[in-house]
């Protein structure tokens, strides 16, 4: 938190194929060791597979999957008088998107398919139809917040 002025958010250029900032952000999250071209190849390959299997616009399916994975509430630890409480808090819009992307990528990597393209395509299709581990993670997060609703008055 700077004292002088608010730090401006870095502008992310849209991706070359779909001209979409969310896809570009997803590529940046997917990328390892700065290999952006590999990240782009993976996501565009996954989009091709989604289009082939569902006969639908892959960008629409991807955005639907992302919306299905976005959490609304999460719990944060708050220490009050020697006890630590899990306090439910609402998630900011930019953090929702970031968490959804992170979960989609993490659970894609843990899937059983052979290549990352197949794993990501499978997880996107599952998430778009409200199935899969990323959606389960969101449900678990919501359940935790619901279970700890009694501590909501500890919000800061």
Swiss-Prot record:
GO molecular function per UniProt: rRNA binding; structural constituent of ribosome; tRNA binding
The keyword rRNA-binding is annotated on this UniProt entry: yes
GO cellular component terms, semicolon-separated: small ribosomal subunit
One annotated GO biological process: translation
Record-linked CDD domains: uS7_Bacteria
Keywords: Ribonucleoprotein, Ribosomal protein, RNA-binding, rRNA-binding, tRNA-binding
The UniProt record lists the keyword Transferase: no
Gene3D superfamilies per UniProt: Ribosomal protein S7 domain (1.10.455.10)
Similarity section: Belongs to the universal ribosomal protein uS7 family.
Job description of the protein: One of the primary rRNA binding proteins, it binds directly to 16S rRNA where it nucleates assembly of the head domain of the 30S subunit. Is located at the subunit interface close to the decoding center, probably blocks exit of the E-site tRNA.
Assembly behavior: Part of the 30S ribosomal subunit. Contacts proteins S9 and S11.
Protein name: Small ribosomal subunit protein uS7
Organism for this UniProt entry: Anaeromyxobacter dehalogenans (strain 2CP-C)
Taxonomic placement: Bacteria, Pseudomonadati, Myxococcota, Myxococcia, Myxococcales
Gene name of the encoded protein: rpsG
């Amino acid at each position: 938190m700077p004292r002088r002025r608010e730090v401006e958010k870095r502008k992310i250029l849209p991706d070359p194929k779909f001209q979409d900032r969310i896809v570009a952000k997803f590529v940046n999250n997917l990328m390892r060791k700065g290999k952006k071209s590999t990240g782009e190849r993976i996501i565009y390959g996954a989009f091709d597979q989604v289009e082939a299997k569902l006969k639908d616009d892959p960008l629409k399916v991807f955005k639907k999957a992302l919306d299905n994975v976005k959490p609304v509430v999460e719990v944060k630890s708050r220490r009050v008088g020697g006890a630590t409480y899990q306090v439910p808090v609402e998630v900011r819009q930019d953090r929702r998107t970031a968490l959804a992307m992170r979960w989609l990528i993490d659970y894609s990597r843990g899937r059983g398919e052979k290549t990352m393209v197949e794993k990501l395509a499978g997880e996107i299709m599952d998430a778009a139809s409200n199935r899969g581990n990323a959606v389960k993670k969101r449900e678990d997060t919501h359940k935790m917040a619901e279970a700890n609703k009694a501590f909501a008055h500890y919000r800061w």
